[in-house]
Amino acid sequence: MSDHKRAVLAGGCFWGMQDLIRKQPGVVSTRVGYTGGQNDHPTYRNHPGHAEAIEIVYDPAQTDYRALLEFFFQIHDPTTKNRQGNDIGTSYRSEIFYVDEEQRQIALDTIADVDASGLWPGKVVTEVSPAPDFWEAEPEHQDYLERYPTGYTCHFPRPGWKLPKRAEV
């Protein structure tokens, strides 16, 4: 376990994010929760300022942070502020919560690549912030789409979506 790394991402409703990210190669575990808000021990009904987020534990021998971010930018729209599909509000913002300086720099570089690529019609509005406390969501929200495969989601892989680095654009 000590060789594993941690990532925290917010990109809209956490159900769809978790369902897709947990299936990625190198992802060891995921859990959904709340982060970046004003209260301790937030709940689904009381999480002022918090984003719905996913905490990812991954094996860096099988994947890297950049690959996770590239998939993150593929499955949600990073150009809409405080919104994903029908979900509107700061809970559904696009935000990368970095755990160290290396993650911060990779996040900024990846955002610059997304902006330069033209894969999304507008500029990226994803925020990049230090990772505050992560509060695990209630059990009914964990692995929601695994239990309810036809449940609500606004996250989708985009076939053929490949993010080039700026030097390759």
UniProtKB/Swiss-Prot annotation:
MF terms (GO), sorted A to Z: L-methionine:thioredoxin-disulfide S-oxidoreductase activity; peptide-methionine (S)-S-oxide reductase activity
Keyword field: Oxidoreductase
Listed InterPro entries: Met_Sox_Rdtase_MsrA_dom, Met_Sox_Rdtase_MsrA_sf
Reactions accelerated catalytically: L-methionyl-[protein] + [thioredoxin]-disulfide + H2O = L-methionyl-(S)-S-oxide-[protein] + [thioredoxin]-dithiol; [thioredoxin]-disulfide + L-methionine + H2O = L-methionine (S)-S-oxide + [thioredoxin]-dithiol
Swiss-Prot/TrEMBL GO biological process terms: protein modification process
Residues at the active site: C13
Enzyme Commission number(s) from the entry: 1.8.4.11
Pfam families from the UniProt entry: PMSR
Role of this protein: Has an important function as a repair enzyme for proteins that have been inactivated by oxidation. Catalyzes the reversible oxidation-reduction of methionine sulfoxide in proteins to methionine.
Name of the protein this chain belongs to: Peptide methionine sulfoxide reductase MsrA
Organism: Mycolicibacterium gilvum (strain PYR-GCK) (Mycobacterium gilvum (strain PYR-GCK))
